[in-house]
Amino acid sequence: MFATPATCDLCAILLPDSGHIQEEDAGFVNRHGYTKHAPALPLYDKHQAIQSLNLLHPQALGNTFSPIPGWKVTLTSAGHILGASSVLVEVAGRRILFSGDLGRPDDLLMLPPEKPPRADTVLIESTYGNREHPEENVIAELGAALKKVSARGGVAVIPVFAVGRAQAVLYAISLLKERGDIPHGLPIFLDSPMAVHTTALYKKHPLAHRLDAQGIRDLENVATMVESTDQSKKLASRHGPMVILAASGMATGGRVLHHLAHYLPDHRNMVILTGYQAPGTRGATLASGSGIVRIHSKDIQIEAEVVQLQSSSAHADASQLIDWLQSMKQAPSQVYVVHGEAEASDALRQRIEHTMGWRTLVPEHGSTWPT
C-alpha cells in the first residue's frame, strides 16, 4: 500500500481503532442473537489492522514511483484533509488522473489543492457536484453560537469527526478567543483519543497544511485533551459554561453519545453540528428539529438548542470542482464523474459539458470503460 507520510500516520491511528470496533460489533450481535452466523466474526480485528500497517510504503508528494513494473504513479496534494492526495497513474502511454476528495481553496487548515497535471483521462469526485457553499463565515457562525451559550451558562456539545473537523473547530475557537469574540477563559475539552492523537500530527507534518508554528501551538493548547474514560466521565460533573468536542461527527457512536444524553434535556445547553448529517443518523435527527432522539436504547428529550453551521464543509463545492478542472493546461480526452450521489454526479457532468465542452460521463456501478 502506498500513501503520503501523513496518511500513513493517520492509518496507524485509525486502522487499529477500526479493528477494535469490528470486534465490538461482532461481539454485540453474538450476545444478542442478531446474526445468522455462528458465531459472527469481525471482518478484521485490531491485531490484523496493526499487522497491515507493515504493508504501508510512504511516498512524498510530487515524487514519482513505480508500484509495479510498467506503472508510474505521482501523488499531488488534494487539500482535503491531512495527507489527502490526487493520484496520477502513467501506464501503457496513457495518463490517468484520480482527483480523490478535493478540498476548498479557502480551507481554514489545509492548503488549496494543487493544480492538476496533464492527463488523458480524469476521474473527478462529485460530493458537492450540485451545491455551492454559502458565503457565511464559519468562524463568525461558531463565535455567535458559543457566545450565546456561554452567556447563559450552558454547555456546548460539538459532535466532530476525529480527523480534520475536530482540528478545524479547535483552531477556529483559538482565533475567536484571540480576537475576544468569546471569553478567553471559556473551558474547551477535546474528548476523543483519536482526535487528540490526530491533532499531534499537525506538528509532525508542518508542510502538509497552512498553519505556522504559532498556529500549531494554538491548536494544541486551546483545549484540554481528554483521553481516558474516567476523565471523560468526570466532565459530566462540571458545570457550564464549557465546550465539549467529541466524536463522532454524525453522532453515530463514540463518546459524544454520553454527552448528548446528559446535556440534551437542559434548555441552557446547545448542540453545534459542524457538517453534513447523513439521513438516518442521530445527527440528522437533531438537525431535523425533532423533540426526541434515541441514545443507548432510551428516548432522550431534546430541550437544548441545536445549531447547524452552514459553511464548515472541507469538500470543494461545484464551482471549485470546475475551477480545478479548468486549471488543467490541456483538456483531457475523457472525464468520468464519480464518488457522489446520483443527482450531484449528473449535475456536475452537465456543468462540465456545458461549461467546457469536454466529453463527460457518469459511469454506472460495475461498468467498464476505456481510459
Language-model features: where?
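His/Asp/Glu-rich metal-coordinating catalytic cores
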Residues: 1-168, 174-184
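Generic long, charged, amphipathic alpha-helical segments
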Residues: 294-325
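Short, conserved loop/helix-junction motifs that constitute active-site signature segments
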Residues: 114-118, 182-183, 262-267, 299, ...
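Hard-cation-handling environments
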Residues: 142-281, 294, 354
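Short, compositionally biased "basic patch" segments
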Residues: 106-121, 196, 202, 277-301
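C-terminal structured "cap/appendage" subdomains that terminate the fold
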Residues: 321-357
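A short, acidic, amphipathic alpha-helical segment used as a generic capping/interface helix at domain edges
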Residues: 254-263, 313-329
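Hydrophobic, well-ordered secondary-structure elements that form the walls
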Residues: 256, 335, 360
